[in-house]
Amino acid sequence: MGITILKNEGLDFHARISTPLSEIDDDIQKELLDLTKKVKIAGFRAGKVPVSIVKKKYGTSVRNDIIERRINNSVNHVIKEHNLNIIGRPKIEELQNESDKALEFTVKIELLPKITIPDLKKISLDRPKLEVNSKDVEEQLEKLAALTKNYTKESKAKIKDGDQVTIDAIGYIKEKAFEDGKLNDFKVIIGSNALIPGFEKQLIGSKTGSKVDVNVTFPENYHAKDLAGKDARFVVQIKAVHTAEPTVIDDEFAKKFQSNSLEELRTHFTKQIENESEEAINTIMKMNLFDKLEKLLDFDVPESLLEQEKNILKSGTDKNEQDESLLKDKSSKEITAYYNKLALRRVRIGLLLAEYAKSKNLQLEPDDLRKVIMQQARNFPGQENMIFDFYKNNPRAIEGLKGPALEDKAVQYIFNHEIKLKEKKYTKEELEKYLEAEEQRITLI
């Protein structure tokens, strides 16, 4: 076998490989002889089929198999001989395998960069810490009480905030009734904002039996595109008004929600508030860590990974209206530059974390994958069981989660064992403002 190195610089390794025809022919002859002992052909006893007959029937497929095997073995030899740390499948080009010439081909191999892990102990980050107070918990209790109000008392008084109103309504645009603009026996809590902005407010002050004209404008982002941004008039018939019975928040109230006492329900809400904030805090901290890492990394990355990441980014932005709006006023050149920079950041950090996980011998446990699946499920409220079933029945989908799961594990290990974390306490209101500001900053990161 002859090997001529054509290129060995950066992350590209190209070589021209040739194998004498005699070696190929020898392999073909051995394979055909083996087949004479195995194949069954009408008119010949088992093991007694002439080579010429076997060659006529199987010669082409045997030759193709031998050539493919030779190519794979040659490429593997080159990789091992030159100690190449490859990514992806080697590309075979300029293949010459005519019967009167040697087997020749060019192999192009993309390499992973050599990664030096920076001194992570020099990195310091603030770690937000939520301090849940009694006011936060009482707000949750009041929300729960509001959701479980019992609207049994019919009212003849004027409609006010908090009342439950039963209505019939017909919607008109330019005095023409529009499709899906009719409501029958529809119940709405005034002030819940369940209807188009401004609709509920215009019912306040009316009474049972009244007919009310409600004028509204559909939001620009309304789900029915043919109605978005349009003015509409609804003729509303007030059929019934009910007020809520006062809800007493006590031990009996708590028992309706699988708690033995009100104190136990308060403890449950305290933990719930902490857990809900923890995921958002971890996401922000992860991005802040990546900001620090980005400044420390300057190694080249494989072009194939870069292109793959750019395509993922573009596809994700096309499906996300908020992300798309951030780029709508940018020129084509600016958008390309943005994607290039962001893709480079992501690929570099991804490669670093993979190398770090390898250096620390971090292994995925079943619980690590469960956490990632739980995170995925939380993105689809009300459809959690569907998400769990999807991953349960799709092993290949589980494979796709292993990369992100290992990355998360590496990040948590860095938080726990490497960088300096300075705890910074926040009230719930302060934390919400901080997280909102941070989320806007890292929307596309």
UniProtKB/Swiss-Prot annotation:
Entry keyword annotation includes Ribosomal protein: no
Catalysed reaction per UniProt? [protein]-peptidylproline (omega=180) = [protein]-peptidylproline (omega=0)
Q: Where in the cell is it found?
A: Cytoplasm
- What EC number(s) does the entry state? 5.2.1.8
**PPIase FKBP-type domain ranges (all copies):** 162-247
- PROSITE patterns registered for this protein in UniProt: FKBP_PPIASE
Q: Which Pfam families match?
A: FKBP_C (PF00254), Trigger_C (PF05698), Trigger_N (PF05697)
Gene Ontology terms, MF aspect: peptidyl-prolyl cis-trans isomerase activity; protein folding chaperone; ribosome binding
UniProt keyword annotation of Isomerase present: yes
Keywords from the UniProt entry: Cell cycle, Cell division, Chaperone, Cytoplasm, Isomerase, Rotamase
Top-level taxon: Bacteria
Q: Which GO terms describe its biological process?
A: 'de novo' cotranslational protein folding; cell division; chaperone-mediated protein folding; protein transport; protein unfolding
**Database matches in InterPro entries:** PPIase_dom_sf, PPIase_FKBP_dom, Trig_fac, Trigger_fac_C, Trigger_fac_C_sf, Trigger_fac_ribosome-bd_bac, Trigger_fac_ribosome-bd_sf, Trigger_fact/SurA_dom_sf
Major enzyme class: isomerase
Which Gene Ontology terms of cellular component type are present? cytoplasm
Give the chief site where it resides.
cytoplasm
Which Gene3D superfamilies has this protein been placed in?
3.10.50.40, Trigger factor ribosome-binding domain, Trigger factor, C-terminal domain
Family named by the database record = Belongs to the FKBP-type PPIase family. Tig subfamily.
State the domain notes.
Consists of 3 domains; the N-terminus binds the ribosome, the middle domain has PPIase activity, while the C-terminus has intrinsic chaperone activity on its own.
Function according to Swiss-Prot or TrEMBL: Involved in protein export. Acts as a chaperone by maintaining the newly synthesized protein in an open conformation. Functions as a peptidyl-prolyl cis-trans isomerase.
Question: What is the official name of this protein in its record?
Answer: Trigger factor
Its organism's taxonomic lineage begins at: Bacteria, Pseudomonadati, Pseudomonadota, Alphaproteobacteria, Rickettsiales
